[in-house]
């Protein structure tokens, strides 16, 4: 870190919402527009999907490793979702914010609630599907989950959708370009 950046403070942006709502696609598009922003890589105990790379897509951990990270306070937040653990490694986020960067977290709803306690200044944005039917189509379109997993994710989504009003902003991902435009406006083109 350069000496003149020690007093600069970045911002933490949390994107959350049900599985299949399009958080990952929106984050990818945001980073294409703002490549200087930093995407925090989450840790998880779930198995990698096709094309996912350890240390790039997620940090893939065993449940024992994840429990160790919790005990050593290496996570800003963590939650269990659909039988797996997810969490945000603390160190890279704190380093990037200290350097004045905008840090994006793409995390589950339970974790996003914890962030309000850890980082009260974080802007928490809930991404909504246009309807539950569209959400189900998106989950099935992935082709990576069993019927049981899809049913669990849809049941979880119903609960999460009821929590949308708890968050600072809500963005409906009906039209990708419009949702992206709204996010850029909420976050700010430049810090």
Curated annotation (Swiss-Prot):
Under CDD domains, the record lists: GMPK (cd00071)
Catalytic activity as recorded in UniProt: GMP + ATP = GDP + ADP
Q: GO cellular component terms?
A: cytosol
**Gene3D superfamilies per UniProt:** Guanylate Kinase phosphate binding domain, P-loop containing nucleotide triphosphate hydrolases
Superkingdom per UniProt: Bacteria
**What are the alphabetically sorted keywords of the record?**
ATP-binding, Cytoplasm, Kinase, Nucleotide-binding, Transferase
For whether the record's keyword set contains Transferase, the answer is yes
* EC numbers, comma separated: 2.7.4.8
UniProt: ATP binding residues: 17-24
- Annotated Guanylate kinase-like domain residues: 10-188
Q: Give the principal location in a single coarse category.
A: cytoplasm
- The enzyme's main class, written as a single word, is transferase
- Where in the cell? Cytoplasm
- Please give one Gene Ontology molecular function term for this protein: guanylate kinase activity
**Purpose of the protein:** Essential for recycling GMP and indirectly, cGMP.
- Which HAMAP family does the record associate with it? Guanylate_kinase
* UniProt-listed NCBIfam families: guanyl_kin
Q: Which PANTHER family match?
A: GUANYLATE KINASE, GUANYLATE KINASE-RELATED
Q: What is this protein called?
A: Guanylate kinase
- Record the organism: Synechocystis sp. (strain ATCC 27184 / PCC 6803 / Kazusa)
């Amino acid at each position: 870190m350069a000496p003149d950046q020690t007093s600069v403070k970045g911002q933490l942006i949390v994107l959350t919402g049900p599985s299949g709502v399009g958080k990952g696609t929106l984050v990818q598009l945001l980073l294409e527009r703002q490549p200087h922003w930093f995407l925090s890589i989450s840790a998880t105990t779930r198995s990698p999907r096709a094309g996912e790379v350890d240390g790039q897509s997620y940090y893939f951990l065993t449940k024992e490793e994840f429990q160790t990270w919790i005990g050593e306070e290496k996570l800003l937040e963590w939650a269990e979702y659909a039988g797996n653990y997810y969490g945000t490694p603390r160190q890279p986020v704190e380093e990037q914010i200290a350097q004045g960067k905008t840090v994006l977290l793409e995390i589950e709803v339970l974790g996003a609630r914890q962030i309000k306690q850890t980082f009260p200044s974080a802007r928490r944005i809930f991404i909504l599907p246009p309807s539950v039917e569209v959400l189900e189509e998106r989950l099935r379109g992935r082709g990576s989950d069993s019927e049981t997993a899809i049913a669990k994710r849809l049941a979880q989504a119903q609960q999460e959708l009821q929590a949308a009003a708890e968050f600072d902003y809500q963005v409906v991902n009906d039209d990708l370009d419009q949702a992206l435009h709204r996010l850029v406006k909420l976050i700010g083109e430049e810090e």
